[in-house]
């Protein structure tokens, strides 16, 4: 069992991914030391994020144990269910993992996209009507705050698609709109809000 990852917790009112990822020498040294100890199979496992439902039944818990302890995956993506279950399973998975897991989430408009009982925000098309992009930035920070409360470190958002293709209706209200300039500005603001809030953002979809 590896020791705890040595890093200075990011204060809620002053989160900084840049400091955590680039400036903390102890963090980088810890990562290097762990990498040197991993077998080839374990290093390959670190490249994978496994999708699992946040359910408390025996079969699901056994599946969680298998992917964490046997396959030694690098991260988890919870999808659907109750917020309380995700929190409990996240804590359980982190206790089992020799290397801290990267907990990811697909929450384009926040936690409510996947989890019941969480704050509900408007779809991106509604947010695309907002002229003040500072509000989109603050929205991103709030989504990040809620993600961190659940132990989520990566949010697969925002959607950067421009809604101009009638043959691709699945995007629809998930897009900030049909203007490339407006979409780009909103994507940057939302991404910066997430990352200043301590959560990595992932713009999508490509190609």
Residue ranges of model-derived segments:
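Enzymes and membrane/adaptor proteins characterized by extended Gly/Ser/Thr/Asp/Glu-rich
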Residues: 53-61, 65-186, 203-207
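Mature N-terminal segment immediately following signal peptide/propeptide cleavage
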Residues: 23-56
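Phosphate/pyrophosphate-binding betaalpha-module
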Residues: 193-205
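Bacterial Sec-dependent N-terminal signal peptides
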Residues: 1-15
């Amino acid at each position: 069992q590896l020791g705890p990852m040595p890093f200075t917790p990011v204060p809620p009112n002053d989160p900084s991914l840049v400091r955590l990822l680039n400036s903390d020498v102890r963090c980088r040294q810890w990562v290097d030391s762990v990498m040197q100890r991993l077998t080839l199979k374990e290093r390959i496992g670190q490249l994978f994020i496994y999708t699992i439902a946040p359910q408390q039944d025996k079969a699901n818990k056994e599946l969680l144990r298998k992917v964490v302890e046997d396959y030694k995956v690098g991260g988890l993506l919870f999808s659907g269910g109750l917020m309380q279950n995700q929190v409990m399973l996240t804590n359980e998975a982190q206790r089992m993992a020799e290397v801290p897991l990267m907990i990811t989430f697909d929450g384009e408009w926040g936690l409510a996209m996947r989890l019941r009982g969480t704050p509900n925000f408007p779809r991106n098309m509604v947010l695309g009507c907002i002229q003040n992009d500072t509000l989109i930035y603050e929205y991103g920070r709030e989504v990040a705050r809620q993600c961190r409360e659940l132990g989520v470190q990566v949010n697969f958002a925002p959607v950067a698609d421009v809604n101009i293709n009638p043959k691709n209706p699945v995007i629809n209200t998930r897009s900030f709109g049909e203007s490339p300039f407006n979409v780009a500005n909103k994507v940057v603001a939302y991404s910066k809000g997430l990352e200043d809030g301590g959560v990595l953002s992932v713009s999508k979809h490509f190609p």
